[in-house]
Amino acid sequence: MKKTLVQKLGLLGVVSFLSYAAAVVFAPLAYPGYDWMAQAVSDLSAANAPSLALWNRLTALYNVCEVVCVTVVCIGIQGRKSRLFRVGVYLFAAMEWTSAVGYRMFPLSDSGYAGAFQDVMHMVVTAAVVLLSIASLVIIIISSAKDKTCLSYGICAAIALFMMLVGALGMKIVPASCFGIVERFSVFAATGFNAALGLHLFLKGEARPVTATPEREA
């Protein structure tokens, strides 16, 4: 069956993931002394980071592709029966938009945390992103347990949530020298799930609206 434009746009989630992964892997080359095992990914995009220019080039497709992907996914799931599932995806979309706009407006002013206004706002954006991420993934997992047609979404959401928890808990447990390792579990969870949503849309297509079957006359 021929793929629709909406389905094809779902592949932008994969493009977004690859753009972000390229930045995480190659941006440290422009940051002398950067220790990926100990430092956060956000240090690479700090306002005064030497790697900022390269980071911006490598992530040129990241934000725009991620928000377009999750937006067309919201369009593509309109016909699904499970309202709970749709709410979960809408919350995830809200998280992606918050992340795309918030982190662009308020990057860290310095590597680590310098305490400036934009650093405080960066933390506020992070808190909103974390809460929306967890809420959306939990709702999608619950909806998949109730509606088996959403099971594959639930499995992907469970993997993403597990990665987030590993990152969040790991950052509290592991020594500072390993902070960057566990932190990367968290940062790749959301963009990975976004890619999964886009692939679902591309492979499964748009859900058709469910219409009530007219009752037959006696």
Residues covered by each model-derived region:
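Interfacial segments of alpha-helical transmembrane regions
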Residues: 6-14, 80-94, 150-157
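Alpha-helical transmembrane segments of multi-pass membrane proteins
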Residues: 17-36
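Interfacial helix-start motif at the membrane-water boundary
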Residues: 44-64
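Internal transmembrane alpha-helix with an interfacial aromatic "cap," most often the third helix
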Residues: 61-87, 135-145, 209
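Small-polar-interrupted transmembrane alpha-helices in polytopic inner-membrane proteins
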Residues: 89-104, 158-167
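Membrane-proximal helix-loop-helix units in multi-pass membrane proteins
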Residues: 99-139
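Terminal transmembrane helical module of multi-pass membrane proteins
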Residues: 140-218
